[in-house]
Every structure is written in structure tokens, then in C-alpha cells.
Amino acid sequence: MTDKQPKTTYRPHRRGTKTRWLWLPSLMFGDGVAVSVLVLTMVMLRRMGLDTADTALAIALLSLPVLLRPLFEMVVTHFWGTTKVWILSTQFISALSLAAVAFTLHTSSWLLGTVCFMPFFVCSSVFYNIALHRFYIDTSQGVHLSQVHQQNPTPQQDTMVRWCDGEMVTLHSSTSHHHNTTTLHSQKSCGFLTMALLFGCGVMMMIAGNMEVVTRNIRYSWSLVFYIMAGVELFLWLWHTIFLPGGTHGYAKPKPTMGLHRGEFRISLRRMLKRKDDITALTFFILFLLPETLLALTAPLFLIAKPHNGGLGLSPQEFAFTQGTLAVIAIALGYTLGGKTIKRHGLRRWLLPSALLLAVPGAALLFLSYNTAAPLSIVAAALAAGHAALGFALSMVKQVVVRFTRNMPDNTLRHAIARTLIATPFVLVGMFAGAMLTLIDYQHIFLVATELSIASLTVAALYLYRTRKK
């Protein structure tokens, strides 16, 4: 199962511009569907009667494949030239997994079915994300990236498009200075991801809540939602089968994979651990988003928990409006604003303010925990403010990742390690989040999350100090 790569020189892509890019929004939309499904799964488990501690533990365990990303990168590396096959295969597996979960929700073994089939979906989503990041396209002539590196690029070949962490990064090659300058253009890809999250966390959550009211059957309602999500994945698979470049034309090719072959991983890792700047960056990835690690699972559970349990008691429809719609739009706006400020003023000026902004999500939830009877408008405003601040901080994290991987022979491995270290605290803290809720209430958790912004401020200052000469 490999895409055959012809040895002859590639001819320019002759298809129309619109036809060439029909796969562009759908790739990013498919990447956002995975996050939406995890949110839907968490709410579904609570609506089906699973307690808070078990729900948090289940979602954290389902997120474990994210920590195996460097290993998955190695697996994909040994299937050279199969980027399109990975994309299509993982989307088909995702569709089958969601359909299996939807089928088991009607039975008494719904929990066993969810636990058995959801790991297939999560693993396939990680592989899909890896394949997406390796999918290179020349925007002008449709030639291989290796051809551009082996010869002096023409003005038409000057712009390459790379997918990196859900953001389109344009690499402008300069033949006169022989260096690459990276500029971020996140508006389009951020918009596609936002649409996917709005569809999954907003529209589908709203449908589930309305179906619960109409049918008075929770199992049927959520089974229908998962069948629809499986249909979306199947449609994307069919769409990419038709419009995704590759196959006999060979427009897709994996990017350089230094450090992902046998023996190279240890060498690259040792080299990384000997550089003080790299150690500082690795520490930054682990600790900067530490305040958000406590909120990633506890905040949604707080929104849907009953008032007598210390929550707000939002219905699925209200959750879809606040967390699935307004909060998603807010985090996208904050992310876009952060990218613009970095482009205008640079990272050093805004890294410390963004660390302080990480206290806003916890403070907003702390305010709501003391005002559980607040109207829906106040809840929506507080969540929007917190997510806008989080989006602004995430844009800073993204820029640090870009600097960590830029102009490195093992940039693919570095990108995988960076994403793994960012996700590790979320998974580990999420495993104990449910147990923490049985010992302390939401107010204390949100207070601790707000205070943890001190760690973010400290590691941001350390990063600025270590990179001051650059």
C-alpha cells in the first residue's frame, strides 16, 4: 500500500486553482472533528449516568495515544511515500469506530463498547494528524519538495505550504541569502478548525439536547449523534479519495524525517538535552500551560454538573451555546489576535503578558463557582473571556514551537516531542482530576488553577532570559 512515485520529472499541475484546493478546508475540518468527538464523548458519558471521577479518568485514558506521537511518527516514517494512504485509511477507521460506538449505545454494554472502540478512533486521529503535517504541496507547480531543495528554486516555486499544528506555515526560500524565514498565516486554517469545533461541540451538542427533549430517550439521541459524526468522517474519506492530490502524480511527499529512523532517535535526543536553549524550551512546553491542565476536564464537568454537586447544571443546549459556540469563537479570535501581535511586536514583548492571561480562565470559572445561579449571559461572557485569553496564550506557545523546530535537521522529531510534552501534563493531571473532585470542590480546584499561573510566568521569564541573545 504505497503511492508509486515516478522517477521522471514532474509536470506542472494543470488542474484549475479551485479544483486543486478543494481538499484544503476538509483536511483541517477533519482534524478538528477529533477534538469535537472527545468533547461529545465526555458529555455523553455523563448523560448516560457515569459519575464524574470515572468520566474524567476515561477521557484521560483515551488521550494516552497522544503521548505516543514520537513512536507513531516512526511508524509512519517507515512507510515512505504513503501520506495519502495514511490520511484515507485513518479516516475510514475513524468512521467505522464511531459507527461501532453508536451501535453499542443501544445495548446494555454501551460502556464496554465505548471503551473498546474509542481507542481506535483516537489512535487513527493521531495518525491522521501526523499524515496531515507531512502533506506537502507546491502551490504553483505541484512538484516535490525534494526537487526544490536539490536545485535553485524559481520564483514560482518560492512558496511552499506546510501544515504544522493546525496552522498554515509558509516557508519563503531565499536563493540570495540561503536561509528560510517563516511567517504565520493562521486565518484560513484557524477558520477551518473553528468550523469543525462549532459543528461538533455546538451543532451536534445542540442536536443531542433537542433529541433528548423530543424523544425522551438519551441512548437514542446520542446514538444518532455518533452516527452523524461517523457519516461526516465517511464523507470526508470519500471527498479526499476524489480530490486529495497524490497517487500517480506524486504531488504528496513526506517531509525530512531525521531522528525518526533506527538509532537516530537517541542521537537526536542526546543532542537536544545537551543544548541549554533546548532544555529551556522543553521545560517551557511542560509548565507554561500548567494552569489549563486542571481546567481541561474539570471545567466542562463543572458546567454540566448539577447545582447540588457544585456545578452550574447546564443542559446540553446551554452547554452547546456557551462552551461549544461562544467559547470556540473566543479562543479562535484570541489565537488570531496573538498571531497578529507576534507579527507586529515580536514574541518577547508579549510572552509575559500572555502568561498572566493564563490566570483569566481559572478566575472566570472561580467567579462562576461562587455564583452558580448566574444567568446564562454572565456564564457565556465569563467563558468567552477565559477562552479568548487562552487562545492568545496558545499563539505564543505555537511561536515557541516554531522557533524550537526551525532550521533543524530533526525538525519532525522536535515537533513531535514538543506536542507530546505539551499534552503530557493534560493527560496526567486529567487522570487524577476525577479523584480530586471527590476530595475537594470545584472552587478549590479553580483557585489552584489560577495560582498556577505563577509557574507559567516563571517559565516564561526563564525562556526569555535564556534566549535573550537571540
Q: Where do the protein language model's features map onto the residues?
A:
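C-terminal ends and interior cores of transmembrane alpha-helices
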Residues: 92-108, 356-374
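Intracellular juxtamembrane helix-capping segments at the cytosolic ends
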Residues: 127-141, 174, 392-407
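Transmembrane alpha-helices of Major Facilitator/SLC transporters
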Residues: 65-69, 319-343, 361, 426
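Intracellular loop-helix junctions on the cytosolic face of multi-pass helical membrane proteins
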Residues: 2-17, 105-114, 127-128, 132, ...
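Helix-loop boundary and gating motifs at the non-cytosolic
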Residues: 9-66, 280-284, 288-306
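A late C-terminal transmembrane helix in Major Facilitator Superfamily
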Residues: 408-439
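Helix-to-loop junctions at the C-terminal end of transmembrane segments
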Residues: 68-82, 333-349, 437
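Hydrophobic core of transmembrane alpha-helices in multi-pass small-molecule transporters
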Residues: 29, 110-128, 374-394
